[in-house]
Amino acid sequence: MNQTASVSHHIKCQPSKTIKELGSNSPPQRNWKGIAIALLVILVVCSLITMSVILLTPDELTNSSETRLSLEELLGKGFGLHNPEARWINDTDVVYKTDNGHVMKLNAETNATTLLLDNSTFVTFKASRHSLSPDLKYVLLAYDVKQIFHYSFTASYLIYNIHTGEVWELNPPEVEDSVLQYAAWGVQGQQLIYIFENNIYYQPDIKSSSLRLTSSGKEGIVFNGIADWLYEEELLHSHIAHWWSPDGERLAFLMINDSLVPNMVIPRFTGALYPKAKQYPYPKAGQANPSVKLYVVNLYGPTHTLELMPPDIFKSREYYITMVKWVSNTRTVVRWLNRPQNISILTVCESTTGACSRKYEMTSDTWISKQNEEPVFSRDGSKFFMTVPVKQGGRGEFHHIAMFLVQSKSEQITVRHLTSGNWEVIRILAYDETTQKIYFLSTEFSPRGRQLYSASTEGLLSRDCISCNFRKEDCTYFDASFSPMNQHFLLFCEGPKVPMVSLHSTDNPSNYYILERNSMMKETIQKKKLAKREIRILHIDDYELPLQLSFPKDFLEKNQYALLLIIDEEPGGQMVTEKFHVDWDSVLIDTDNVIVARFDGRGSGFQGLKVLQEIHRRTGSVEAKDQIAAIKYLLKQPYIDSKRLSIFGKGYGGYIASMILKSDEKFFKCGTVVAPISDMKLYASAFSERYLGMPSKEESTYQASSVLHNIHGLKEENLLIIHGTADTKVHFQHSAELIKHLIKAGVNYTLQVYPDEGYHISDKSKHHFYSTILRFFSDCLKEEVSVLPQEPEEDE
């Protein structure tokens, strides 16, 4: 690799001490005018040399305080972002956790803080999670926490009296030292709910006896109030499958029945003489799915459980429930989705009678996105707001806010669109009935950022950006959370600089209090030579698609650099954003002078449905085509070394990377795939069927989308496969099938297995995991230095 040579800054230019006049016999005389001119010329030349040295000297010489980023530093405390877990407990008070572990209460009107729980409490009881009761008198402390799937975990729980220090265990009746699947406070006073052996238990307060609300729970078969794997990972994106009414008098919950769903077996190889196996229901594409029912149980007086029925169209079909929300003390709004995921019906159900009325139906020729979105209702239920796809000329459909007005007598609904444009409304946050304003996050300011906006729901529908002028050099990517009465809001700055959390008044957003600065991270970042980022827009098949390049800090366009292309983990995601990002690839950029590229091609999200849904029935081919087009563009840049290209992907990204590597286009010297999906038939039903349909009807589509089909294209590739054997999301079966086909085709590969590790590698193995990836790319991408043959010595 060409590098700028080191040059000393101390340059001395001295004139000769003796200047003789030539062609003169007379005694030496000094020509003072000539000497002065000569000295001036020498000084000018020295100045120019010094200036050019300063301009051409790399950053590491001009700023010696900056150091390169190491993996040890990346995984150390200095690079840990602190999440204060801030949440509203009423309209003026926020509860959060400081970076040193104290649990505090902050008053939004006075900025006064109160210590609720000392950090020593967590140490004393070895607790890693906590939850405060609504009356702030007690705290649930979780210890011996063991992760199950992405969101779910088991734990043992203590109830701790904040004022007296009194402690007692939370156990079901006649059970000691229990391990619970879930435990949390209700919405009023000291209400408690917990789940044990797939059944829901309820306590009106901490002194009361537990009441078992369900009895049908059965391990691995019937789940009450918590999600099975499919609902947790692909549908609810949470392990919580129950919802409190605002007054705490009712509880809605799902009963998920997996009795017909085939089980997946995950062996545990270490720690015992014979391997043990864990089984859990996992429906693959086209296989039997879980059935689901929605119930509401009355918690005051005699317990009474009522089933809320699906719309008639779904009674004889398979369906999912993807969203449940209380809109009053007795009414819930529910989203029902058919198995192909192209028909969605929104109903409002009266929990006292079980009667449900249809409010909105959506259909699609592909699939319906934003399945979990919660509508925002007015207090009297006469109007509600949610995002719907709206056509914006040739750019296709974008998600925008619609206001639905319900006629009280006829139940007819009129719709008014509040926003429009070639940008996306990400999420509706709140509706203020006093000001008639709706608050939301959108990409209007930048498709790669997120800003907080308000819009009037009456008159001219004027729209204001609330966050656009807040620390705009540091923050262009936001999230927000409003207090119950919308008088205040928390603003979460997530980039491009180090994230921070601030508290604002809705009436005067410029008046704010910084709740979390992440000062340690900020201080650490200032000492590091981190990458410079640049975003370019590529025009591919009438689409404008963003490419992000991360350059080494010492980047010079005259030099040539290796390139790493990183593929997104999920379809519908967004790689090119203004979020703060420091990860293992930052180490590679810094230590090996590699340029890292991220590209949002077709199939990516937040650029309209036309871009997103191009992959329908064409999964793997469209994404690969666009990523290859981005590589062809980069190869035209003089600073990219065409002989040193590499690719990385995890999960679905590993699948796309494999499809690219086996294609006819041979650009890459090496590639790494982590937990790669190799065949969509082997993956989750809700995921595969969303994009490809049912295997029984789309056999050729599934075959064309499989990495295992025509795998000879990988013969010339230098491939590293990494997989944990206990991966419950992308099973090791995917890598086993891939390896079997690679061996059959005579393809060389390198395999790194992590015994009993899941999709997310644990902290104890993380250093080895990242070291393996970095070492592989470092060896692959190092600059080849050709050695000139030595000439034979001549005989004397």
UniProtKB/Swiss-Prot annotation:
InterPro entries: AB_hydrolase_fold, Peptidase_S9_cat, Peptidase_S9B_N, Serine_Prot_S9B/DPPIV
Tissue: Detected in brain cortex, hippocampus, thalamus and cerebellum Purkinje cells (at protein level).
Glycosylation sites recorded in the entry for this protein: 63, 90, 111, 119, 257, 342, 748
Processing and modification events after translation: N-glycosylation is important for cell surface expression, specially at Asn-257, which is crucial.
Localization per Swiss-Prot or TrEMBL: Cell membrane
Bilayer-crossing regions: 35-55
Membrane association type: Single-pass type II membrane protein
Pfam families: DPPIV_N (PF00930), Peptidase_S9 (PF00326)
Keywords, alphabetical: Cell membrane, Glycoprotein, Membrane, Phosphoprotein, Signal-anchor, Transmembrane, Transmembrane helix
GO CC term (a single one): plasma membrane
GO BP term, pick one: regulation of potassium ion transmembrane transport
Mediates effects on KCND2: region residues: 1-55
Modified residue annotations for Phosphotyrosine: 138, 143
Topological domain spans for side Extracellular: 56-796
Segments on the Cytoplasmic side according to the record's topology features: 1-34
Signal peptide: none
Gene3D superfamilies: alpha/beta hydrolase, Dipeptidylpeptidase IV, N-terminal domain
Function comment: Promotes cell surface expression of the potassium channel KCND2. Modulates the activity and gating characteristics of the potassium channel KCND2. Has no dipeptidyl aminopeptidase activity.
Binding partners and assembly: May form oligomers. Interacts with KCND1. Interacts with KCND2. Identified in a complex with KCND2 and KCNIP3.
Family named by the database record: Belongs to the peptidase S9B family. DPPIV subfamily.
This protein's name: Inactive dipeptidyl peptidase 10
Gene label: Dpp10
